[in-house]
Amino acid sequence: MAQSGVFLRNPGHLTSAPQAALLFSLVLTSFHLSCGTETSSSNSTLSAHHPDPGTLEQCANVDFCPLASLCCRASVDEYGWIAAAVGWSFWFLTLILLCVDKLMKLTPEEPKDLAA
């Protein structure tokens, strides 16, 4: 308990620890979410699904990718969506770290609701 008082008196030690913890938790969360989407998509194919008559789902053994690549424009593939999600996560992490940095610089005498 005595050591926690020492750390609270000297905020210089606390500035890098929360940033590292937030960065580490963001990396773990993004990894967990990317692995979770792969497992959920593989589980959805295992469920019993009865396609409607007259749809392309009835042609399970036909590869439509070559035909689609001739007709359709290229879009964001599955890795592009993951990269976009990671990019947005880093953007929000940056905002969180800026807020944490601002809170760490406040002294007890200053009110916490100052204009930005």
UniProtKB/Swiss-Prot annotation:
Subcellular localization, as worded in the UniProt entry: Membrane
Membrane topology according to the record: Single-pass type I membrane protein
Superkingdom classification of source: Eukaryota
GO annotations of cellular component type: membrane
Transmembrane keyword on record: yes
Stored InterPro entries: TMEM213 (IPR028121)
TM spans (from-to): 80-100
One Pfam family recorded for the sequence: TMEM213
Keyword entries, A-Z: Membrane, Signal, Transmembrane, Transmembrane helix
UniProt keyword Transmembrane helix present: yes
Ranges of the Extracellular topological domain: 36-79
Major localization listed first in the record, in broad terms: membrane
Ranges in the topological domain labelled Cytoplasmic: 101-116
Annotated signal peptide: 1-35
PANTHER family assigned: TRANSMEMBRANE PROTEIN 213
Protein name: Transmembrane protein 213
